[in-house]
């Protein structure tokens, strides 16, 4: 049981580190939309700017897909003989990795859009806050981590059945 706990903590720690390292990548891949302050003090953006708001979420999901697959593969390699514990460790690791990426990305900034726009002068261009706009994007990381676990366990089960020369048959009535 101690070995399972150690391996689980290792997988979880690796996930958190991967999430923290993914945040600067996420930040560098996103072009934040901007608002331009007019002479009357009103802030406006373009139609393209409105659609770019969701590029932050889409890029986060794309990075989560890659990091989740890495976490799932690492979890399988380290915990393939541990059964459901490996799946649980991969799931927790992926969720914490996603949250670490989100947290570090928001810390990198920018933030305080309302304050920045309020103190802006006419003609200034102010980027929106760097933020994730939906928590559902975190689930991409979790699902991506489960895919390698499911595929590898399916292939391992088939390999095991072919080695014994027996295929499991269902008994029908």
Region annotations inferred by a language model:
Residues 2, 6-14, 59-63, 85-89, ...:
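Alpha-helical transmembrane segments of integral membrane proteins
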Residues 65-75, 93-96, 100:
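Alpha-helical transmembrane segments within multi-pass membrane transporters and channels
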């Amino acid at each position: 049981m101690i070995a399972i706990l150690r391996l689980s903590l290792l997988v979880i720690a690796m996930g958190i580190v991967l999430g923290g390292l993914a945040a600067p990548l996420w930040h560098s891949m996103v072009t934040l939309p901007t608002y331009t302050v007019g002479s009357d003090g009103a802030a406006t953006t373009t139609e393209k700017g409105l659609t770019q708001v969701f590029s932050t979420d889409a890029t986060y999901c794309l990075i989560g897909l890659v990091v989740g697959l890495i976490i799932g593969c690492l979890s399988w390699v380290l915990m393939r003989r541990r059964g459901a514990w490996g799946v649980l460790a991969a799931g927790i690791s992926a969720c914490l990795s996603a949250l670490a990426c989100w947290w570090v990305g928001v810390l990198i900034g920018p933030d305080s859009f309302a304050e920045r726009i309020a103190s802006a002068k006419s003609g200034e261009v102010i980027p929106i806050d760097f933020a994730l706009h939906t928590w559902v994007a975190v689930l991409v990381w979790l699902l991506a981590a489960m895919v390698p676990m499911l595929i590898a366990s399916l292939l391992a089960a088939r390999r095991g059945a072919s080695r014994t020369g027996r295929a499991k048959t269902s008994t029908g009535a």
